């Protein structure tokens, strides 16, 4: 953070993956605590598009508690009260990005990504964290289906060829970058 020579200001969203319950594929709270507290950040996430232990807000909050994130900061499941659309530039597959309503509550975002394998995307990192991670449940479905549907129940029957998914993910990540403008950092 210090090496970037830019200060996060205002209401700061710290975008991470809170990780699947029982798993270890997330940044450990002890690793990010000092940065999160230095910028008075709120850890932000959105619910998943698949049924599991982060599909509902209540279960997602419990997963974040179990992984220790509530011990270091406030945690906001941004689509807990709805969603809204933000524009995308590249409309080859998706016409907009569907994000959690609480995104409006933040002036600045720090994208704290970790590297892991992903069944559809190849590798997860900054782009996945900013696209799939900021999208609401319906938004995740919309991206994964390359704009065919936003209905989570229809996700698995509408998967596109991989390039269409990857291009949709890139378009949605760009929309979040555009939304924050200069008020975003990538670590």
Feature roles, as predicted:
Residues 1-38, 42-187:
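Extended, low-polarity segments enriched in aliphatic/aromatic residues
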